[in-house]
């Protein structure tokens, strides 16, 4: 599955690159391809969460921090579709980009911690975390090109850093914090996917988005 995701990601990224090389790639096409990348990113994070669930202790979810503790929780984002529809296109794109870039270092941390997790599928988990990085980088490049085409927002947001550089000193803490960090990413990747699909719909000037 990783090879399939990687092949499609490279193909979609190559298509997004056409716009920066002088080829006539319309905004709708660029948003379509960015939406496909974001959909794959969220699907991959869901698959990774399911892998962790197979051997995750029930007590772990009780001890896990609340979603409000995610490092991106303070980033102001639309709460629902109606609110997102009132946000200008350039600003909504800036929000999606800030969310995505906030995960550069956390995804690197997840990939570095995955091989030593106390989990029987840590090899597969490691492969998927690396694939998350590749997908995220591909989408980031696509969003940069979209911002260049649409124009930057006057309310451009900055990425939020992750505080702390490790997941804990004992195996249980590391597994719980790994799961928590992944759950935060899954939530944010869902937001990014929704925002990009909404932008795609608005670019197509559909009556109902």
Curated annotation (Swiss-Prot):
Transmembrane segments: none
Location(s) in or outside the cell: Secreted
One example of a Gene Ontology biological process annotation: positive regulation of receptor signaling pathway via JAK-STAT
Gene: prl
GO molecular function, one term: hormone activity
Disulfide bridges in this chain: 70-184, 201-209
GO cellular component terms given for this protein: extracellular space
Family, as annotated: Belongs to the somatotropin/prolactin family.
Keyword terms, alphabetized: Disulfide bond, Hormone, Secreted, Signal
SUPFAM superfamilies per UniProt: 4-helical cytokines
Signal peptide: 1-24
Keyword presence, Transferase: no
The protein's name in its UniProt record: Prolactin
């Amino acid at each position: 599955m990783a090879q399939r995701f990687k092949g499609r990601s490279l193909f979609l990224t190559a298509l997004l690159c056409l716009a920066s090389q002088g080829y006539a790639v319309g905004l709708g096409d660029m948003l379509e391809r960015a939406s496909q990348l974001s959909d794959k990113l969220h699907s991959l994070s869901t698959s990774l969460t399911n892998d962790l669930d197979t051997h995750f202790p029930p007590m772990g979810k009780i001890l896990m921090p609340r979603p409000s503790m995610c490092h991106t929780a303070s980033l102001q984002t639309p709460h629902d579709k109606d609110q997102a529809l009132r946000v200008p296109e350039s600003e909504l794109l800036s929000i999606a980009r800030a969310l995505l870039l906030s995960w550069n270092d956390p995804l690197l941390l997840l990939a570095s911690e995955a091989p030593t997790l106390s989990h029987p599928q840590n090899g597969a988990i490691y492969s998927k975390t690396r694939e998350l990085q590749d997908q995220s980088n591909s989408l980031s490049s696509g969003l940069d090109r979209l911002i260049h085409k649409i124009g930057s927002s006057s309310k451009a947001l900055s990425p939020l850093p992750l505080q702390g550089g490790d997941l804990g000193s004992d195996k249980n803490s590391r597994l719980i914090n790994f799961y928590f960090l992944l759950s935060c990413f899954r939530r944010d990747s869902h937001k990014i996917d929704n925002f990009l699909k909404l932008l795609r719909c608005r670019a197509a000037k559909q009556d109902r988005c």
